[in-house]
Design a protein with these regions (language model features):
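Conserved alpha/beta-hydrolase
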Residues: 33-52
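Flexible "cap/lid" loop of the alpha/beta hydrolase fold
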Residues: 88-132
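Hydrophobic, aromatic-rich cap/lid helix
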Residues: 145-170
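Conserved alpha/beta-hydrolase "acid-adjacent" motif
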Residues: 189-196
Length: 234
């Protein structure tokens, strides 16, 4: 079934240390969407994939700029899905323009996006990249290994982490987002809980994936099923 006539383009945004190719193309998710008739707009965030990779943290202060550029000056809404950092960037874009999106799927984020940034958590991950984290700090080491994948620039990814942070998202701003929102999180994801985030949206549903951690989420079959259903691509 070709559904382009009924549905807008679908913007897809990867997470920290990923890229459109690594996150959405290699897994076959983009192919499933295009075979159903969806038009995909793939975005590589600054510091990732085919985008420029500056090493100055200040270059990453506007995290959603690549998304807003990809959307352009459209007169109609688009759909979007983002994982982890990509979900945060999409949420930032939606607060810049609450009418950007028709349907918005946020994957792998929780209540933490409503709280003040904790620099010590960033330093944990930076330690993982630099190889200075404690041997028992599994999460930091996972992030470090992720940063050192062949196609990545660890210095650029460290700069992303050290970027100037905006104030936390506020529920009153999230209430203005006109999109139907779906939040998807694995039951073993460190970003849980997500109750305050869910309650901040006017129209939001939550899906918890069984036996799934943060890094496994984009390739989880339950996630892919939910994505196809939410965006009408079944």
């Amino acid at each position: 079934m070709n559904i382009n006539s009924a549905n807008p383009p679908l913007v897809m945004v990867h997470g920290w240390g990923g890229s459109h190719q690594e996150t959405w193309q290699k897994s076959g998710v983009e192919q499933l969407l295009t075979e159903s008739g969806r038009t995909v707009i793939g975005v590589d965030l600054l510091g990732h994939g085919t985008a420029a990779k500056p090493h100055d943290p200040a270059a990453y202060s506007d995290i959603s700029e690549p998304i807003r550029t990809a959307i352009g000056a459209r007169s109609s809404t688009v759909d979007a899905v983002g994982f982890s950092l990509g979900a945060i960037a999409l949420l930032h874009a939606a607060t810049v323009n609450p009418n950007y999106f028709r349907r918005l799927m946020l994957v792998g984020i929780g209540n933490g996006v409503l709280d003040e940034h904790d620099p010590s958590e960033t330093q944990r991950i930076v330690g993982g990249i630099e190889g200075t984290s404690a041997t028992h700090d599994v999460l930091a080491r996972q992030f470090g290994n992720y940063a050192k994948k062949t196609s990545n620039d660890p210095s650029a990814l460290k700069a992303v982490l050290l970027r100037p942070r905006s104030k936390p998202f506020e529920p009153k701003d999230l209430k203005t987002i006109s999109a139907r929102v779906s939040v998807v999180i694995g039951d073993r994801d460190f970003v849980l809980p997500a109750d305050r985030l869910i309650e901040s949206f006017e129209n939001c549903e939550l899906t918890i994936l069984k036996n799934c951690d943060h890094f496994a989420t984009p390739e989880n079959f339950g996630f892919i099923d939910q994505l196809l259903e939410f965006f009408g691509a079944e």
